[in-house]
């Protein structure tokens, strides 16, 4: 009997010990689960949960873009020459084999918008309160290469921003339908209400932006600045970095605006007419309205909301808009001239001390072939590592380190058919910096 009682006590002791262990494990598990609790659908990276490295890692892994090629993007963004050479050699091997995503692909995948946004890794919540409180507007003028458009949209997308997309009327129907399918998945992305056929170097390129300006001003989104883009652009700053840069402008605009050369003055000396292309006539134009001095720049701007409003509503601005309609490449002198007009919000004086080069403005980073050379001998930048079109560098992987050293918000031109590795690394760099706040 004594032996049986001893066995019962022993069993009861083991039972209590095991129960205690289970309870201890449960408490530890609960504490760990609370410690590592991460809601990846949280609206703010500054929330308490996301202060932990674990949660940041979870979010980054859920949004990390799949690498198409095994290249050393961290090395490339830091200017490591071995990594750059390997990427350039890899590009020579694969660029003719790579098939871009097609309109049909996007028409199919966007039938399920949530699947499309998840699979293509769109960031679907504001990454900080500062960004939430400073929405940016985009005018996106595109005409071809649907994958380029979708990747550009993904790179600049944030749910608090607003995006107007203008598609060239002449674009193939499949392209138009694919763009419509993509933007139908986002409440803050829309097609311009009026579309025009865009002819190179003609007024229609400006009209496309003006149409988006009108639509964006009617939006309920209280955007602060407007950036305009084309299909060969790509951001080189995160949305958070853009917000910081735009705040530092303090209501000023940023765009190239310089005294025109004699050859560029010919662009508005005679009237131009448009058929399928733009051609000059023998009809001389009257001087610019309101004795306004003309300046030249490029098609890209960083413009305050007040500037945009005055482009459309100010009578003096409208007179200049009408006057440049029959000039050559009016987008390269309309914005540059309005930026020096004293009645325009955020403008700067016409005095030579206020001339702004494309390298000084933050709107767009471009490598011009005729400026490339030996930096140690005074050239503004080294030769293009990609190819040239119309004397503009189509960037290669060897340009990325230089690109990232500059203060511009976007760069031009990129083409994955020329070098997809530079885009892959830029996408990886921006996504990493957006989540972690640090470079690769």
From Swiss-Prot:
Domain of life: Viruses
Transmembrane regions listed in the UniProt entry: 13-30
Coiled-coil ranges from the UniProt annotation: none
Catalyzed reactions: a 3-O-[beta-D-galactosyl-(1->3)-N-acetyl-alpha-D-galactosaminyl]-L-seryl-[protein] + UDP-N-acetyl-alpha-D-glucosamine = 3-O-{beta-D-galactosyl-(1->3)-[N-acetyl-beta-D-glucosaminyl-(1->6)]-N-acetyl-alpha-D-galactosaminyl}-L-seryl-[protein] + UDP + H(+); a 3-O-[beta-D-galactosyl-(1->3)-N-acetyl-alpha-D-galactosaminyl]-L-threonyl-[protein] + UDP-N-acetyl-alpha-D-glucosamine = a 3-O-{beta-D-galactosyl-(1->3)-[N-acetyl-beta-D-glucosaminyl-(1->6)]-N-acetyl-alpha-D-galactosaminyl}-L-threonyl-[protein] + UDP + H(+); a beta-D-Gal-(1->4)-beta-D-GlcNAc-(1->3)-beta-D-Gal-(1->4)-beta-D-GlcNAc derivative + UDP-N-acetyl-alpha-D-glucosamine = a beta-D-Gal-(1->4)-beta-D-GlcNAc-(1->3)-[beta-D-GlcNAc-(1->6)]-beta-D-Gal-(1->4)-N-acetyl-beta-D-glucosaminyl derivative + UDP + H(+); 3-O-[N-acetyl-beta-D-glucosaminyl-(1->3)-N-acetyl-alpha-D-galactosaminyl]-L-seryl-[protein] + UDP-N-acetyl-alpha-D-glucosamine = 3-O-[N-acetyl-beta-D-glucosaminyl-(1->3)-[N-acetyl-beta-D-glucosaminyl-(1->6)]-N-acetyl-alpha-D-galactosaminyl]-L-seryl-[protein] + UDP + H(+)
Glycan attachment positions: 72, 108
MF GO annotations: acetylgalactosaminyl-O-glycosyl-glycoprotein beta-1,6-N-acetylglucosaminyltransferase activity; beta-1,3-galactosyl-O-glycosyl-glycoprotein beta-1,6-N-acetylglucosaminyltransferase activity; N-acetyllactosaminide beta-1,6-N-acetylglucosaminyltransferase activity
Enzyme Commission number, as recorded: 2.4.1.102, 2.4.1.148, 2.4.1.150
Lumenal side: 31-440
Pathway involvement of the protein, from the record: Protein modification; protein glycosylation
Keyword Glycoprotein: yes
Disulfide feature: 73-230, 164-384, 185-212, 393-425
One BP term from GO: protein glycosylation
Other comment: Was acquired from an ancestor of the African buffalo around 1.5 million years ago.
Function: Non-essential glycosyltransferase that can synthesize all known mucin beta 6 N-acetylglucosaminides. Mediates core 2 and core 4 O-glycan branching, 2 important steps in mucin-type biosynthesis. Has also I-branching enzyme activity by converting linear into branched poly-N-acetyllactosaminoglycans. Contributes to the post-translational modifications of structural proteins.
PANTHER family from the UniProt entry: BETA-1,3-GALACTOSYL-O-GLYCOSYL-GLYCOPROTEIN BETA-1,6-N-ACETYLGLUCOSAMINYLTRANSFERASE 3, GLYCOSYLTRANSFERASE 14 FAMILY MEMBER
Protein name: Beta-1,3-galactosyl-O-glycosyl-glycoprotein beta-1,6-N-acetylglucosaminyltransferase
Species assigned in the record: Bovine herpesvirus 4 (strain DN-599)
């Amino acid at each position: 009997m004594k032996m049986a009682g001893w066995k019962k006590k022993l069993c009861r002791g083991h039972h209590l010990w095991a129960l205690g262990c289970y309870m201890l494990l449960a408490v530890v598990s609960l504490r760990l689960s609370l410690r590592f609790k991460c809601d990846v659908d949280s609206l703010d990276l500054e929330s308490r949960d996301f202060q932990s490295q674990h949660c940041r890692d979870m979010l980054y892994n859920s949004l990390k873009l799949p690498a198409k090629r095994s290249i050393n993007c961290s090395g490339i963004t830091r200017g490591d020459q071995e990594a750059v050479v390997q990427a350039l050699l890899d590009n020579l091997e694969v660029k003719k084999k790579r098939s871009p995503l097609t309109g049909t692909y996007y028409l199919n995948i966007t039938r399920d918008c949530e699947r499309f946004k998840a699979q293509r890794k769109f960031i679907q919540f504001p990454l900080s309160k500062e960004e939430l409180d400073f929405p940016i507007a985009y005018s996106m003028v595109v005409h071809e290469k649907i994958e380029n458009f979708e990747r550009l949209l993904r790179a600049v997308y944030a749910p608090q921003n607003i995006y107007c997309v203008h598609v060239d009327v002449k674009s193939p129907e499949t392209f138009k339908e694919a763009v419509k399918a993509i933007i139908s998945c986002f409440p803050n992305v829309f097609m311009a209400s009026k579309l025009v056929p865009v002819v190179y170097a003609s007024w229609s390129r400006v009209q496309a932006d003006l149409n988006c300006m009108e639509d964006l001003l009617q939006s309920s989104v209280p955007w602060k600045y407007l950036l305009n883009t084309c299909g060969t652009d790509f951001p080189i700053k995160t949305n958070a970095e853009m917000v910081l840069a735009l705040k530092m402008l303090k209501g000023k605009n940023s765009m190239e605006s310089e005294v025109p050369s004699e050859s560029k003055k010919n662009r508005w000396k005679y009237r131009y007419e448009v058929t399928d292309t733009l051609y000059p006539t023998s009809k001389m134009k009257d001087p610019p309205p309101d004795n306004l001095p003309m300046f030249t720049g490029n098609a890209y701007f960083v413009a305050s909301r007040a500037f945009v409003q005055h482009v459309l509503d100010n009578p003096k601005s409208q007179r200049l808009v009408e006057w440049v309609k029959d000039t050559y490449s009016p987008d390269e002198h309309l914005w540059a001239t309005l930026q020096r007009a004293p009645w325009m919000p955020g403008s700067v004086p016409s005095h030579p001390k206020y001339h702004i080069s494309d390298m000084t403005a933050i709107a767009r980073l471009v490598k011009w072939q005729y400026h490339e050379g030996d930096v140690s001998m005074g050239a503004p930048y080294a030769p293009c590592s990609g190819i040239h079109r119309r004397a503009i560098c189509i960037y290669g992987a060897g340009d990325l380190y230089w690109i990232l050293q500059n203060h511009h918000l976007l760069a031009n031109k990129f083409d994955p058919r020329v070098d997809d590795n530079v885009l892959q690394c830029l996408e990886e760099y921006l996504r990493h910096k957006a989540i972690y706040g640090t470079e690769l």
